[in-house]
Amino acid sequence: FSAHRTPHKVEEYGRHAQSRGLKVIIAAAGGAAALPGALAAWTELPVIGIPLPSSELKGIDALYAIAQMPPGVPVACVAVGSWGARNAAYLAASIIALSHDGIAASYRAFRDNQRQG
């Protein structure tokens, strides 16, 4: 959904994310990229923002919008596009792994496998 076109949906999603059992929110957005920051305003959960290359600026506008959040409304920002999407998933897994042994073991195995080449 769009933070600009459907702000009521953003509020609803953010306010109730934790009670629905979510541990981390991943939000992708292009252009003005308000979605990650708007969600962060409505939840205490970690929010990871993925800037998308949706305009002539190839995602630089979205990168700045997500990375330049004001103090007190943090959003973790990953790379633009598909690499960012992958890293957002890995970052979310590492956060959830702090309190979930099964995910911790799987994530550790994934990282060990990466190091092996």
Regions found by a protein language model. Name each.
Residues F1-P7:
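Short beta->alpha junction loops
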Residues S2, L52, V80:
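Cofactor-binding loop segments of dinucleotide-utilizing enzymes, especially the Rossmann-like FAD-
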Residues R5, A33-A34, W83:
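Short alpha-helical
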Residues H8-Y13, P36-L39, I60-A62, N87-A88:
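Short, well-ordered secondary-structure micro-motifs
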Residues Y13-S55:
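Glycine-rich phosphate-binding loop
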Residues K58-G117:
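C-terminal binding/interaction regions
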